[in-house]
């Protein structure tokens, strides 16, 4: 069985969220923070986490900083600990979008 989740994030909204004192550390892992150089990257990772939770069908039932989006040597994203999954993150204009597919 396949489960699919998709999320879209307005990059300017992420920019405002990143201005809040504790937002970054409550949502992103240290590895993700080190990886991100632009607001667009944070927005893409956030969208991937939301898409993952939608695919799981559980809603936001955990701290987002306990989910880690990793990248291989070619830059392909994946979810740490979710072997049966595929992740796609894209940016266009004012938006970042992510789709996650989980399978059993």
Place the predicted regions along the sequence by residue.
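Core catalytic alpha/beta fold that binds nucleotide/phospho-ligands
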Residues: 1-104
């Amino acid at each position: 069985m396949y489960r699919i989740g998709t999320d879209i994030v307005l990059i300017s909204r992420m920019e405002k969220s990143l201005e809040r004192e504790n937002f970054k550390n409550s949502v992103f892992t240290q590895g993700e923070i080190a990886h991100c150089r632009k607001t667009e990257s944070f927005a893409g990772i956030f969208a991937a986490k939301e898409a993952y939770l939608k695919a799981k069908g559980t809603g936001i039932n955990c701290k987002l900083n306990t989910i880690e989006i990793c990248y291989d040597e070619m830059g392909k994203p994946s979810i740490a600990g979710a072997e049966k999954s595929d992740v796609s993150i894209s940016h266009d204009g004012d938006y970042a979008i992510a789709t996650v597919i989980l399978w059993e």
